[in-house]
């Protein structure tokens, strides 16, 4: 089936002595292999990370508060249309209970989106609220602001009318446990048809036809 496989990463902080993400292990490279596009939620921190990522696929970045450099692939806000899904990206996206339209007004200047991608917190997040999929892929290198270790990424599979989103753990590193809580969400024609948290299926909303 035609479609786009999109990798989501964010907050790629690296120890000062690390020269490439490969030195943390092969897991991130393996995850990025074969995707069609990479969306980075900001805090690239070190510019060479963008070139490293782009060996796998084109990359688009929402500039983070630690990204004090210019790059044509990076902007404070990004807006993309992929397979009929409108995707907004901004770095500072913190959990809050206000209605999503209020969140979009602040984060995206009121632009309507189907998917809102952010970063900053280093904590994974995946929810469907007020008709919008909200995703924070966490951090692959500094999850939950713990010491440097393997963390989380996310994957979006997009086809017209169908979306599958998943938070993915990169595994454990050097005896350090990964604090990730895996989760996934699947939409068909903007309706949830599957949703899980830490491997447990969640109740689905009831829709009136």
Regions found by a protein language model. Give the residues of each.
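Helix-adjacent hinge/juxtasegments
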Residues: 60-112
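Active-site environment of divalent metal-dependent phosphoester hydrolases
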Residues: 14-18, 44-49, 66-72, 94-100, ...
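N-terminal active-site segment of His-dependent metallophosphoesterases
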Residues: 1-54, 68-76, 149-150, 184-187, ...
């Amino acid at each position: 089936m035609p479609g786009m496989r999109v990798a989501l990463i964010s907050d790629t902080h690296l120890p000062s002595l690390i020269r490439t993400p490969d030195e943390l292990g092969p897991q991130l490279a393996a995850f990025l292999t074969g995707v069609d596009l990479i969306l980075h939620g900001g805090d690239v921190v070190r510019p060479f990370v963008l070139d490293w990522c782009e060996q796998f696929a084109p990359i688009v970045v929402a500039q983070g508060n630690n990204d004090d450099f210019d790059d044509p692939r990076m902007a404070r806000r990004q807006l993309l249309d992929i397979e009929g899904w409108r995707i907004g990206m901004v770095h500072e996206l913190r959990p809050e209970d206000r209605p999503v339209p209020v969140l979009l007004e602040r984060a995206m200047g009121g632009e309507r989106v189907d998917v809102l991608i952010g970063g900053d917190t280093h904590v994974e997040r995946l929810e469907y609220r007020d008709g919008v999929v909200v995703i924070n892929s966490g951090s692959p290198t500094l999850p939950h602001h713990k010491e440097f270790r393997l963390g989380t990424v996310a994957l979006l599979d997009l086809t017209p009318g169908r979306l599958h989103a998943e938070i993915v753990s990169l595994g454990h590193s050097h005896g350090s446990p990964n604090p990730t809580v895996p989760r996934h969400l699947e939409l068909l024609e903007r309706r949830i048809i599957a949703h899980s948290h830490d491997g447990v299926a969640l109740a689905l909303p009831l829709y009136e036809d």
